[in-house]
Every structure is written in structure tokens, then in C-alpha cells.
Amino acid sequence: MSDTIRTLQGRVLSDKMDKSITVAIERKVKHPLYGKFIKRTTKIHAHDEQNQCNAGDIVTIRECRPLSKTKSWTLVEVVTKA
């Protein structure tokens, strides 16, 4: 196992669940044939203990042990409020 903890930065899509948020992580992928860079998004469920996030916030999340069937990330900080 690696010693570094994975951290990602993304935008909160939904905060409707109790103590959970849905974060959209955007990355750029090069098209295999044409070479153009395309935006791709990944949705990740993260744990928000204090329910401090709102939709549209930019947040930093880090990987942790599995907290539920779909949650294995936790909120580190809110970078910018929406």
C-alpha cells in the first residue's frame, strides 16, 4: 500500500442526504484518435460530518475506509462557498 492519502478537489452536486454529499470530479482525457482533450466527470459520495456543504461549493475530499456501500471518501475542507 502507498503511504500517501489520495485527495481530490471537486464541486458539490448534491447535499440532500444526511451527513453525505455528492462531489463531481472533473478530469481531461485525450481522445485516442483525434487528440482533442475532452472533459469527463466522476461522481463520488463523501462523508460530511457537520452538514456544512451546500450545492455548488468547491471542496477537498480524501480517501478513507469504506463508510457504507458507496461512501469511501470524507470531507477535508470547503475551499470556496457557493
UniProtKB/Swiss-Prot annotation:
Work out whether the entry's keyword set contains Zinc. Answer: no
User: What is this protein's name?
Assistant: Small ribosomal subunit protein uS17
Q: Name one Pfam family in it.
A: Ribosomal_S17
Q: Which GO terms describe its molecular function?
A: rRNA binding; structural constituent of ribosome
SUPFAM superfamilies per the UniProt record, alphabetical: Nucleic acid-binding proteins
Name the CDD domains for this protein: Ribosomal_uS17
The UniProt family comment states: Belongs to the universal ribosomal protein uS17 family.
Q: Which UniProt keywords apply?
A: Ribonucleoprotein, Ribosomal protein, RNA-binding, rRNA-binding
Gene name of the encoded protein: rpsQ
What does this gene product do? Answer: One of the primary rRNA binding proteins, it binds specifically to the 5'-end of 16S ribosomal RNA.
Q: NCBIfam families attached here?
A: PRK05610.1, uS17_bact
Q: Which organism is it from?
A: Shewanella pealeana (strain ATCC 700345 / ANG-SQ1)
